[in-house]
């Protein structure tokens, strides 16, 4: 990815993301982002819409599942990624080339909405500690202790498990 040009697109999803799985089991979500530029016409004192760009986009693996479970048709999103061209042959035998956005980062725009973010457990056991018998331990509490940005439950807010106060002195 070093040296590759990334672009950012802000627009609305035209449909719910389509989640599929490859034969090897990798998740992929495909969707279209519609982005319409708006300019202010001083003569008419009104906003004018430009031509809408419909950009196909794809996202892979765990992020694909997160996108499919979080974003829906009409959601205003901010997506950043790399443009990739792909050639294919239609059923009629015609050769086609399309340009798609290979998404690196995506999220809802908070300009006209609000969102609650729920952190997911990462696959590959990066955040999960195992007990002696090989079964997962209390991953949520372990991850919270290891993560300085984790939110304490209200009952524990302001104090550590060792009884010392975590509130700053000011």
Curated annotation (Swiss-Prot):
Annotated GO MF terms: single-stranded DNA binding
Compositionally biased tracts (Polar residues): 117-129
Query: Where does the record place the SSB domain?
Result: 1-110
Q: List the disulfide bonds.
A: none
For whether the record's keyword set contains DNA-binding, the answer is yes
User: What Pfam families has UniProt attached to this entry?
Assistant: SSB (PF00436)
KW Transport (keyword) present: no
Q: Which SUPFAM superfamilies match?
A: Nucleic acid-binding proteins (SSF50249)
Top-level taxon of origin: Bacteria
Q: How does it assemble?
A: Homotetramer.
Q: What is this protein called?
A: Single-stranded DNA-binding protein
Name the species this protein comes from: Paenarthrobacter nicotinovorans (Arthrobacter nicotinovorans)
């Amino acid at each position: 990815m070093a040296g590759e040009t990334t672009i950012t697109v802000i627009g609305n999803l035209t449909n719910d993301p389509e989640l599929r799985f490859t034969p090897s089991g990798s998740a992929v979500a495909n969707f279209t982002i519609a982005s319409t530029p708006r300019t202010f016409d001083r003569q008419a004192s009104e906003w004018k819409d430009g031509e809408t760009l419909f950009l196909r986009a794809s996202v892979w693996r765990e992020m694909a599942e997160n996108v499919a479970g979080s974003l829906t048709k009409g959601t205003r999103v901010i997506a950043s990624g790399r443009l990739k061209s792909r050639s294919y042959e239609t059923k009629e035998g015609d050769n086609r080339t399309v340009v798609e956005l290979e998404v690196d980062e995506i999220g809802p725009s908070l300009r006209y909405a609000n969102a609650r973010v729920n952190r997911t457990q990462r696959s590959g056991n990066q955040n999960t500690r195992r007990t002696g018998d090989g079964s997962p331990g209390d991953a949520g509490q372990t991850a919270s202790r290891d993560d300085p940005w984790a939110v304490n439950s209200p009952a524990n807010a302001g104090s550590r498990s060792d009884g010392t106060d975590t509130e700053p002195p000011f």
